[in-house]
Curated annotation (Swiss-Prot):
SUPFAM superfamilies: 4Fe-4S ferredoxins. Binds 2 [4Fe-4S] clusters per subunit. [4Fe-4S] cluster 2 binds at residues 70, 99, 102, 105. GO terms for molecular function: 4 iron, 4 sulfur cluster binding; iron ion binding; NADH:ubiquinone reductase (non-electrogenic) activity; quinone binding. It comes from the Bacteria. One of its GO terms (cellular component) is plasma membrane. This is NADH-quinone oxidoreductase subunit I.
Length: 159
């Protein structure tokens, strides 16, 4: 009989509305994403970048440790030897659709050449736009060098 009266007076609906009104006047916990952005952790792993030294020379020494450690096999490197005996990459491709953003490539790099930057807004309509070549990775590194250097400096004691 009590269940019948509860359903007759729409007890569940009234209880739900009271709960809604309780939270209606509390401060919001969500953000309006495209217009407001939450702070990013210094350990955030976003879009990849290749860094350069201060003199403009690329840091990558073509040791291929990042290619070997990548669990998704998203990195492809080809290298040639220079006249001075050092090795440099001729091809450095990352397939961002395969990448799982684990950060192992960044941890394996002995010269901090490959890093994951602060950008997380790099969606694309085509698959080919998400295959990054060496030039695009170097452009990303040039664009975010100050942010990347401060991020690596903050995280240095934990590495």
């Amino acid at each position: 009989m009590i269940n019948y009266l509860k359903s007759f007076f729409l007890y569940e609906i009234v209880r739900g509305m009271v709960l809604t009104l309780k939270y209606f006047f509390k401060p919001k916990v969500t953000i309006n994403y495209p217009y407001e952005k939450s702070p990013i952790s210094p350990r955030f792993k976003g879009e990849h970048a290749l860094r350069r030294y201060e003199n403009g020379e690329e840091r990558c020494i073509a040791c291929k440790l990042c290619e070997a450690i990548c669990p998704a096999q998203a990195i492809v490197i080809e290298a040639d030897e220079r006249e001075d005996g050092s090795r440099r990459t001729t091809r450095y491709d990352i397939d961002m659709t395969k990448c799982i953003y684990c950060g192992l490539c960044q941890e394996a790099c002995p010269v901090d050449a490959i890093v994951e930057g602060p950008n997380f807004e790099f969606a694309s309509l085509t698959h080919t736009a998400l295959i990054y070549d060496k030039e695009r990775l170097l452009q990303n590194g040039d664009r975010w060098e100050q942010a990347l250097a401060s991020k690596l400096h903050k995280d240095y004691e934990y590495r």
